[in-house]
UniProtKB/Swiss-Prot annotation:
The gene is ssb. Residues 117-152 are annotated as: Disordered. Residues 5-111 form the SSB domain. The lineage of its organism: Bacteria, Pseudomonadati, Pseudomonadota, Alphaproteobacteria, Rickettsiales. Pfam families: SSB. This is Single-stranded DNA-binding protein. Plays an important role in DNA replication, recombination and repair. Binds to ssDNA and to an array of partner proteins to recruit them to their sites of action during DNA metabolism.
Length: 152
């Protein structure tokens, strides 16, 4: 198998209102925290257990930034597809720090609003990246193009 794949798919809830910042060039970037919760039944005690994992999400895609600005708030349920990236920086004391983030920045990125409160306010595709390949869009099929006669 040639090449490699870096793809993250998450379904979870936004932990706090998304934070928007603007670069020096005027490009908008959104940061948000997404919680995913795993539940299971303990084999010994039969208790229901759960563990929540928090994910840092950074959105560079203009189309997705626009959707998040308008519709996403604390508690919103999202489906996201992006890639995993680790960033390095130096803190105020010069110490190297690292953070790993789910990044949505290219045509392979997706964000879908799963809340019923949000889905009534816009059409289903408004949450998808505008950078998707045209062949991945939904196309309706017109049955009138088919011949009525069976060829055998």
């Amino acid at each position: 198998m040639a090449g490699s794949l870096n793809k993250v798919i998450l379904i979870g809830n936004v932990g706090r209102d998304p934070e928007m910042r603007t670069t020096g060039e005027g490009k908008k970037i959104i940061n948000l925290s997404l919680a995913t919760t795993e539940t299971w039944k303990d084999r010994i005690t039969s208790e229901r257990k759960e563990r929540t994992e928090w994910h840092r999400v950074v959105i560079f895609s203009e189309g997705l930034v626009s959707v998040v600005e308008r519709y996403v708030t604390k508690g919103s349920k999202l489906y996201i597809e992006g890639s995993l990236q680790t960033r390095k920086w130096n803190d105020n004391s010069g110490q190297e720090k690292y953070t790993t983030e789910v990044v949505l920045q290219n045509f392979n990125s997706q964000l879908i609003l799963l809340d019923s409160k949000n889905s009534n306010n816009h059409n289903q595709d408004s949450g998808h990246s505008e950078y998707k390949h045209p062949e991945t869009k939904n196309h309706s099929f017109d049955h009138s193009d088919l011949d009525d006669e069976i060829p055998f």
